[in-house]
């Protein structure tokens, strides 16, 4: 079955070149492990260098493959508890049903969503519904694929106000080493991206966005270069003269180090630059 992307994953390759390998202004640690009983644990914590504020989260996941069930529990330092139950590929091939709930013990606030997604060879569909008896918000998206071309639509409808609150379109093309993505959000925000895999070591990306009625055009270019199987360098720059640099090194299997820096090219001597440090551990 063809892996037709969801609407949010359109243009993902270009986004990854811009976003992965950076962690400006923070120290971050990620840990992932799996018990012998099949329970997956993942935890992360980060501290911002400018404010000193620290936060973290913990997630456990258990899969019952014979029944297509996945149970996920989440907790963060804001004392928010989350539970997610998903059922996949059993009622129909490519169909995934999910119940996602959030509970805040300090305030007693509860919220939840019912989610459904369906993927086949040439399309993918999805819908989320807020569990809110005062008037749920309905989210929906669809992506069609044909010979590398991708067309997508995303919407949200506020039933309490009987109003369409989101209305987005996207069009793109995907090949083995090249991707093009364009989108229009609510008829006012326009954007596009180009991803190119030059060879096995070099990936490049260009991003462009602007808003109707404004002269503020956002433009950026990014690149990633693999020095070897363990080391990679990343760099990006935008029209605001913000320069991002990243260095990723696999120290040993399951241990990855990331160093990054954000430089303000317009105020190079004034300071205000940001650095970041990240560790990823997997066992």
From Swiss-Prot:
InterPro entries: Porin_dom_sf, Porin_Euk, Porin_Euk/Tom40. It is found in: Mitochondrion outer membrane; Membrane. One of its GO terms (molecular function) is nucleotide binding. Ubiquitinated by PRKN during mitophagy, leading to its degradation and enhancement of mitophagy. Deubiquitinated by USP30. Keywords: Acetylation, Ion transport, Isopeptide bond, Membrane, Mitochondrion, Mitochondrion outer membrane, NAD, Nucleotide-binding, Phosphoprotein, Porin, Transmembrane, Transmembrane beta strand, Transport, Ubl conjugation. It catalyses: chloride(in) = chloride(out); K(+)(in) = K(+)(out). The modification Phosphoserine is found at residue 241. Its main location: mitochondrion. There is a cross-link at residues 53, 109-110, 266 (Glycyl lysine isopeptide (Lys-Gly) (interchain with G-Cter in ubiquitin)). NAD(+) binds at residues 242-244, 260-264. It holds the Pfam family Porin_3. GO terms for biological process: sperm mitochondrial sheath assembly; spermatogenesis. Non-selective voltage-gated ion channel that mediates the transport of anions and cations through the mitochondrion outer membrane and plasma membrane. Forms a high-conducting channel with a stable open state and a voltage-induced closure with a mild preference for anions over cations. Involved in male fertility and sperm mitochondrial sheath formation. Belongs to the eukaryotic mitochondrial porin family. Consists mainly of a membrane-spanning beta-barrel formed by 19 beta-strands. Interacts with ARMC12 in a TBC1D21-dependent manner. Interacts with MISFA. This is Non-selective voltage-gated ion channel VDAC3. It comes from Bos taurus. The gene is VDAC3.
């Amino acid at each position: 079955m063809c892996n037709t992307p969801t609407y949010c994953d359109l243009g993902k390759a270009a986004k990854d070149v811009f976003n992965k390998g950076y962690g400006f202004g923070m120290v971050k640690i990620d840990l992932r492990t799996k018990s012998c009983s099949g329970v997956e644990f993942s935890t992360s914590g980060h501290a911002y260098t400018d404010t000193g504020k620290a936060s973290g989260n913990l997630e456990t996941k258990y899969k019952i493959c014979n029944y297509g069930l996945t149970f996920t529990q989440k907790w963060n330092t804001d004392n928010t508890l989350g539970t997610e139950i998903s059922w996949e590929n059993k009622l129909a091939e490519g169909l995934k049903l999910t119940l996602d709930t959030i509970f805040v013990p300090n305030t007693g606030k509860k919220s939840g969503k019912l989610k459904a997604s369906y993927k086949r060879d040439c399309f993918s569909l999805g819908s989320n519904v807020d569990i809110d008896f005062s008037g749920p918000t309905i989210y929906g998206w669809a992506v069609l694929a044909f010979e590398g071309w991708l067309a997508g639509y995303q919407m949200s409808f506020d039933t309490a106000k009987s109003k369409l609150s989101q209305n987005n379109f996207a069009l793109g093309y995907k090949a083995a080493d090249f991707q093009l993505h364009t989108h229009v959000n609510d008829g006012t925000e326009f954007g596009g991206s180009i991803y190119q895999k030059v060879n096995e070591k070099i990936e490049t990306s260009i991003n462009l966005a602007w808003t109707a009625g404004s002269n503020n055009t956002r433009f950026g270019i990014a690149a990633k270069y693999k020095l070897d199987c363990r080391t990679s360098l990343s760099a990006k720059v935008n029209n605001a003269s913000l320069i991002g640099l990243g260095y990723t090194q696999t120290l040993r299997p399951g241990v990855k180090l990331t160093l990054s820096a954000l430089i303000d090219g317009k105020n190079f001597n004034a300071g205000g630059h940001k650095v970041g440090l990240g560790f990823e551990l997997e066992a």
